[in-house]
Amino acid sequence: MTTRTLRFYALVGFLVFLDQVTKYLAHAYLARDFIVIPNLFRLTLAKNSGAAFSFGTGFSWLFFLLGIIALIFIGWFLPRTTGSIVFLALLQGGIAGNVFDRLFKPPYFGNGEVVDFLNTPLFSGVVFNIADLFILAGVFGTFLFLKGSK
């Protein structure tokens, strides 16, 4: 395993750890909404059986399967890329954090619910988590990196 690959998986591991710690804290301490910035940002505990930003609610097993496929693809793609590993690590870490929830949170084994807790009126009715932000940053960063390399 190359140093680059080790750094990649160390970053992914750190991102998954950060995601799981924030979800644990939200689950343990958010009994009700906590307003951080009035009319802009609040913490709201929610459980999501859909994808990022509550898209596709009720299809947890499908997003679990797609997440596993994405993790395998990124792992396969990593040694074939010469670009920055940061955006791929953000993508891999975010996907892995939510796949972890689907696997180990009730009702378990691919059907678990993802813990969401970040809420802003900018995205009406959408509650999300740190892993969703990692995925979003990874997708946009990878897209911009690939677009800029042409």
UniProtKB/Swiss-Prot annotation:
Give the way it sits in the membrane.
Multi-pass membrane protein
Ranges in a coiled coil: none
**First-listed, main subcellular location of the protein, grouped into a coarse class:** membrane
Reactions performed catalytically: Release of signal peptides from bacterial membrane prolipoproteins. Hydrolyzes -Xaa-Yaa-Zaa-|-(S,diacylglyceryl)Cys-, in which Xaa is hydrophobic (preferably Leu), and Yaa (Ala or Ser) and Zaa (Gly or Ala) have small, neutral side chains
Pathway involvement? Protein modification; lipoprotein biosynthesis (signal peptide cleavage)
Covalent S-S links between cysteines:
none
Pfam families the UniProt entry points to = Peptidase_A8
Alphabetized, the UniProt keywords read: Aspartyl protease, Cell membrane, Hydrolase, Membrane, Protease, Transmembrane, Transmembrane helix
- Which example biological process does GO assign this protein? proteolysis
Location within or outside the cell: Cell membrane
- The answer to keyword Transmembrane helix applying to this record is yes
Which GO terms of the cellular component aspect does the record hold? plasma membrane
Catalytic site positions: 116, 132
Membrane-spanning intervals of the chain = 8-28, 58-78, 81-101, 126-146
Q: Which GO terms describe its molecular function?
A: aspartic-type endopeptidase activity
Q: What class of enzyme is it?
A: hydrolase
- Name the Enzyme Commission number(s) assigned to this protein: 3.4.23.36
Protein purpose: This protein specifically catalyzes the removal of signal peptides from prolipoproteins.
User: Which family, according to the similarity comment?
Assistant: Belongs to the peptidase A8 family.
Q: What is this protein called?
A: Lipoprotein signal peptidase
The gene it comes from is lspA
